Amino acid sequence: MQTGRDEPILEPDLPIIDAHHHLFDRPGLRYMIDDYLTDTRAGHRIVASVYVETLAFARTDGPSVLRPLGEIEFANGIGAMCDSGRYGCRACAAIVGHADLQLGDQVAKLLDQAMERAPERFRGVRQVTIEDPSDVPYRFIPNRPPGGVMKSPGFRPAFAHLAARGLSFDAAVFHHQLPEVIELADAFPDTTIVLNHCGHAMAMELNATARERVFHDYRRLMIEAGLRPNIYCKVGGLGMPFWGFRFEERRDAIGYRELAKAWRPYVETTIEAFGVNRCLMESNYPPDGRSAGFVPLWNALKYIVRSASADEKAALFHDTAARVYRIRVPVAQPGKATST
């Protein structure tokens, strides 16, 4: 994990809702609430966060469709603890739980029980659907997702249950799968889809010419996705190996300017495609910690958009996430207290 906590904090007073992070305790990798709170106290003003599923703490018995409730209950407990205000950041203020949408109408029972158990925080579901014809990216994916999830017979019947409950869908795909997300958005215009990680250009182990070709295709597809008003996009996830930056191979501390230089084309493409009112800044911690310390990561995102107006920065770093995930947290302003 990169650290880089000695960097000066850019715009330290800017309120941030971290739109995407995880907590888990796995062999060889433990990142729990104390670890996350340590990162949030490093200088950036993280006021709240969105917990996103990794099937951590899922139940190990009972009906398979309901097993994700274990993780939702775990995250809800953390959210309740942090909502006391004793810990600074209101971590897990919103929860995106797991659902196996291949199970069709059975998923309705999971959604209803999740809403009963975490009514103030459960806001949507995610099912990782990334696919690639090569085996290269799967070296970094602990549990290889099944193929063809979005085309499975049960997927759309399950997906149809989200909008009526006011729930969103977090889409985790590679860039070449964006046509499937676009098709889904067109078929369900009343369902909010939140694209993860800047659309996730898959460019591992490619030469410069091939990377340029990937970026051209990526940009075209992102602009097309941005034409759908019900698709939003998280800005981050750029510290993962799939982008091909190879920062994860480095042992020296990587500063925010170097990160910003590499990440800028993808961040700018995302914001151009979706606009600030449909973009949400994320840490994607701890996965992005392979390449970027928590402080340099947020510094890099701030640096890339440094020319944006105050209102645009508020939307990118706080307001869009608050609106999409219905998060209400007190934000102390200099000389007064307000709520968002």
How should these model regions be labeled?
Residues M1-G88, N299:
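An N-terminally biased module of ancient metal coordination in phosphate/nucleic-acid-related enzymes
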